[in-house]
């Protein structure tokens, strides 16, 4: 029995040592990139930024009321209707069907249902984003890159890319579906993204096995922390110190520092790694079979009810009226 215990202890020591050698750099990068993310998030176009960069909306160009736009889209009801000069600087209605799905665009002047954006329309949207004050250099079409890893952009792919000549050297991504700017990424934000979210979420490994890779690396991190805590407690003298007078057996400064710091921050490190593991919802542990919320019933009545009564204010929530 004693032999088995000693052998188990030896294997635990070896496990902690070599797992630490193999994973130390990864977890240092994970920690450092997480600190970066606390101050510089993943690039995104916030509602405030979008509203601030919308061109002035000239009410004289709006020939259709919201209800007419709804009929032009072939719908009787909608979950949401917005009017803004978001496509090539021209006024368009954005209509979200009540049943969900792709957002429809209706030209507020002609009543035509808009198709996919052309390169010329995408370029006009990019120029209008800065009020035509800066030149735009075309960067082609991309399906996904380091700054557009998000499910919210799936309906807009592929994306037109434009490098703007503004002081911040902003990169604009324009939806090929709607023709509106859906993401802005200044050069400084792009740079921090590479050492922040891009590195933290292991985006270079994104693919069919990305989720499993992150989950199992986190599991190994939990095992590394638990084994180190157990070994650290075994080696710590609670009753009487070692001959050196220290309660840690290690004479080398680095080893003694590692032993003491490991015990002090074991709980913090374990909860940090474990919370990251749980954020990935491993093996669907947070799955539910509960009945999905009936969103249509939750929203209530039809969005088209009484829309024409407030033609020039009901649909202008996302636009700015010209003086």
Model-derived segments and spans:
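Conserved histidines in hydrophobic membrane contexts and catalytic metal-binding motifs
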Residues: 2-323
């Amino acid at each position: 029995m004693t032999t088995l215990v000693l052998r188990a202890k030896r294997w635990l020591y070896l496990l902690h040592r070599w797992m630490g050698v193999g994973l130390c750099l990864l977890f240092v990068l994970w920690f450092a990139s997480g600190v970066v993310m606390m101050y510089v998030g993943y690039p995104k176009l916030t509602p405030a930024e979008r509203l601030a960069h919308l061109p002035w909306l000239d009410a004289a160009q709006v020939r259709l009321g919201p209800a007419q736009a709804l009929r032009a889209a072939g719908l009787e009801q909608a979950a949401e209707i917005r009017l803004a000069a978001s496509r090539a600087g021209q006024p368009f209605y954005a209509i979200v069907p009540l049943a969900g799905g792709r957002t429809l665009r209706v030209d507020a002047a002609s009543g035509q249902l808009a198709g996919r954006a052309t390169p010329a329309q995408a370029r006009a949207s990019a120029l209008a984003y800065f009020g035509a004050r800066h030149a735009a250099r075309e960067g082609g079409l991309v399906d996904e890159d380091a700054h557009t890893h998000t499910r919210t952009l799936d309906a807009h792919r592929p994306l037109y890319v434009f490098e703007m000549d503004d002081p911040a050297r902003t990169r604009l991504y324009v939806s090929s579906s709607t023709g509106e700017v859906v993401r802005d990424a200044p050069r400084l934000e792009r740079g921090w993204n590479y050492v922040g979210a891009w590195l933290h979420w292991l985006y270079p490994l994104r693919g069919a096995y990305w989720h499993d890779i992150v989950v199992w690396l986190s599991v190994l991190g939990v095992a590394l922390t638990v084994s180190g805590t157990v070994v650290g407690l075994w080696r710590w003298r609670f009753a009487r110190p070692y001959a050196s007078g220290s309660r840690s057996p290690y004479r080398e400064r680095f080893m003694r520092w590692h032993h003491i710091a490991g015990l002090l921050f074991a709980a913090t490190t374990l909860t940090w790694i474990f919370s990251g593991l749980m954020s990935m919802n491993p093996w669907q542990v947070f799955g539910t079979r509960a009945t999905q919320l009936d969103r249509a019933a939750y929203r209530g009545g039809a969005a088209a009810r009484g829309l024409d009564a407030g033609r020039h204010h009901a649909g202008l929530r996302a636009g700015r009226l010209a003086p």
